[in-house]
Amino acid sequence: MPELPYSHIRGIIFDLDGTLYVCEAFADTIQDAAVSYIAQLLGIRQAQACQLMADTRARLTKSSGTVQTLSAVCSELGGNIRDLHRYFEENLHPEDYIARDERVIRLVKHLSRHFPLHIYTNNNRPMATRIINQLGLNGLFQRIFSIDDDWLAKPNEQALAGILLKTGLTPAEALFVGDRYDVDLRVPEQFGCPVYLSRTVEQLLRLEELLAGRGDPV
């Protein structure tokens, strides 16, 4: 990925899960909930559903050449994304897993004084809101773009074009930050947006240093 064109950036669009926080235990819980949903849907055992989903993800990834999302896997197996996210809302409890990180709070507050900040997530709005509140980041993002806005899961060119339109940012002005290149960053980069891959909190915290090179001091 190219170096960030600092002087052009006028807004930042963050992924949520795995980007603004990293919690393997909660990620595992999301996966387990999806397995339970598919097991109930198909009338099979948990272990069978888990293996079926793993095989399906591997097949889809091989045929497409890109890593496939949980939404894509469940849809391929006959699941309904609306029902899947309803199941998530009813069964997931992020408050039991996600810990607040004061370093991230300071970073996001600092960036919000210099850029409009937004969230673009494959999570649903109620769950995303609960996670943002748990992280202590409520009120710092101008807009939250979630999967239940139009039920177009990332990566999706139509959804991305709509986000750029709604934020009033040109591709060159919109920095996308995410932990999965194929899911969060590949399409924005194809649009001409600067992107930043962040898979750890330490990588996320480097944003302040990297963006200090833009025209206005950060």
What kind of feature is each model-predicted range?
Residues 1-12, 82, 105-109, 115-218:
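Asp-based, Mg2+/Mn2+-dependent phosphohydrolase catalytic module
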Residues 2-102:
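N-terminal helical cap/lid subdomain that shapes the substrate entry/recognition surface
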